[in-house]
């Protein structure tokens, strides 16, 4: 290894060592609403004005903005003639971190700090599903305000963005669909968006009784309580969004068998919306996020995971599906059409 390669390797090692700082700074920027302020202002904003807006001294804020600019979360612009103040503008990345975009989801990832939110050497060595004593608990989840606001908002923003991607890039897939059941559909936000976009669909939101009991009425959506391990309501299409990555292969096969029983053999299909990992870990611009999500699932579910094409093919075949087609919806997740 030459000196240049060695220096580059050491620099990369330093970057890994300080990797947590990036998450921390971006989390703080979201809490201070910096992405929203830059977006709503609509033009470059001075450091002094931004300092007044967020309540952080200019000398400290300058260092934070310098860090954010290095990572593309803001853009330093030229100062007006006669001014010496720093000016910052939004970027495509900062727009993605606003409250109406992925801000809440990124905030959740940065907020978690308990044993269940990280990978440990001991956890990787264990072959047993961890109990509460081993896994520990994140005090954040004992805080009702956190659970209600941060966690709920994070899950909602993720679902909203993915559903929008489905509507925009898979609209033709809903032609001729008379009924659709969303398995694990929670309070029906995703299904409500789909029914609004494709009003000819009769939506069935299927979840556990304790979830359905708290759901508010939605136009075009019927709420049904039950367990996906026992049965699934009959429909033209069964949808599983962010569901199967929580479960082991055997559990996924059981769930998919119940879904297969619920659709017409000749015309029905199961829609799976989850990430697909490339065999070599490479891929498009979402590749790193998918790998990170896979490791997260290993930490918080033990047997859950993001699957490769080969792994998806295996569980679909074992569940009795004769073929499947992968659709690119230009998101972290892909859409898999599975046919009985």
UniProtKB/Swiss-Prot annotation:
Keywords: Methyltransferase, S-adenosyl-L-methionine, Transferase. Pathway: Flavonoid metabolism. S-adenosyl-L-methionine binds at residue 207. Its EC number is 2.1.1.-, 2.1.1.232. One of its GO terms (biological process) is methylation. PROSITE patterns: SAM_OMT_II (PS51683). It is an enzyme of class 2 (transferase). Nevadensin is a selective inhibitor of human carboxylesterase 1 (hCE-1), a key enzyme responsible for the hydrolysis of a wide range of endogenous and xenobiotic esters. InterPro entries: COMT-like, O_MeTrfase_dom, Plant_O-MeTrfase_dimerisation, SAM-dependent_MTases_sf, WH-like_DNA-bd_sf, WH_DNA-bd_sf. One of its GO terms (molecular function) is protein dimerization activity. Disulfide bonds: none annotated. The active site is at 245 (proton acceptor). Expressed in leaves. It catalyses: scutellarein 4'-methyl ether + S-adenosyl-L-methionine = ladanein + S-adenosyl-L-homocysteine; acacetin + S-adenosyl-L-methionine = apigenin 4',7-dimethyl ether + S-adenosyl-L-homocysteine; diosmetin + S-adenosyl-L-methionine = luteolin 4',7-dimethyl ether + S-adenosyl-L-homocysteine; chrysoeriol + S-adenosyl-L-methionine = velutin + S-adenosyl-L-homocysteine. Gene3D superfamilies: Vaccinia Virus protein VP39, Winged helix-like DNA-binding domain superfamily/Winged helix DNA-binding domain. Homodimer. Belongs to the class I-like SAM-binding methyltransferase superfamily. Cation-independent O-methyltransferase family. Flavonoid 7-O-methyltransferase involved in the biosynthesis of polymethoxylated flavonoids natural products such as nevadensin and salvigenin, aroma compounds which contribute to the flavor of sweet basil, and exhibit pharmacological activities such as anti-allergic, anti-oxidant, antibacterial, anti-proliferative, and anti-inflammatory effects. This is Flavonoid 7-O-methyltransferase 2. The lineage of its organism: Eukaryota, Viridiplantae, Streptophyta, Embryophyta, Tracheophyta. The gene is FOMT2.
């Amino acid at each position: 290894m030459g000196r240049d390669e060695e220096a580059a390797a050491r620099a990369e090692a330093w970057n890994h060592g300080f990797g947590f700082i990036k998450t921390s700074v971006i989390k703080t920027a979201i809490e201070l609403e910096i992405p929203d302020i830059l977006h709503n202002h609509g033009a470059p904003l001075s450091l002094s004005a931004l300092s007044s807006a967020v309540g952080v001294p200019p000398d400290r804020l300058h260092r934070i903005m310098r860090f954010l600019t290095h990572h593309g979360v803001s853009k330093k612009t030229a100062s007006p003639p006669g001014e010496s103040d720093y000016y910052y503008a939004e970027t495509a990345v900062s727009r993605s971190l606003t409250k109406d975009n992925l801000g809440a989801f990124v905030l959740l990832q940065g907020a978690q700090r308990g044993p269940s939110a990280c990978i440990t050497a001991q956890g990787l060595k264990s072959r047993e599903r961890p109990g509460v004593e081993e896994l520990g608990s994140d005090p954040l989840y004992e805080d009702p305000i956190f659970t209600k606001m941060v966690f709920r908002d994070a899950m909602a923003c993720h679902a909203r963005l993915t559903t929008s991607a489905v509507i925009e890039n898979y609209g033709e897939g809903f032609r001729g669909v008379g009924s659709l059941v969303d398995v694990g559909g929670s309070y029906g936000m995703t299904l409500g968006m789909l029914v609004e976009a494709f009003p000819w669909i009769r939506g069935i939101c299927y979840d556990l009784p304790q979830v359905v009991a708290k759901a508010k009425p939605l136009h075009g959506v019927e709420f049904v309580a039950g367990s996906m391990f026992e049965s699934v309501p009959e429909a033209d299409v069964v949808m599983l969004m962010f569901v199967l990555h929580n479960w082991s292969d055997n559990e996924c096969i059981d769930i998919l068998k119940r879904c297969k029983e619920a659709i017409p053999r000749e015309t029905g299909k199961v829609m799976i919306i989850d990430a697909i990992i490339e065999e070599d870990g490479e891929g498009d611009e979402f590749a790193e996020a998918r790998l990170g999500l896979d490791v997260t699932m290993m930490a918080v579910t033990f047997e859950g995971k993001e699957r490769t094409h080969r792994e998806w093919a295996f569980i679909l075949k074992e569940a009795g599906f004769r073929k499947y087609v992968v659709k690119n919806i230009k998101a972290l997740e892909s859409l898999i059409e599975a046919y009985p």
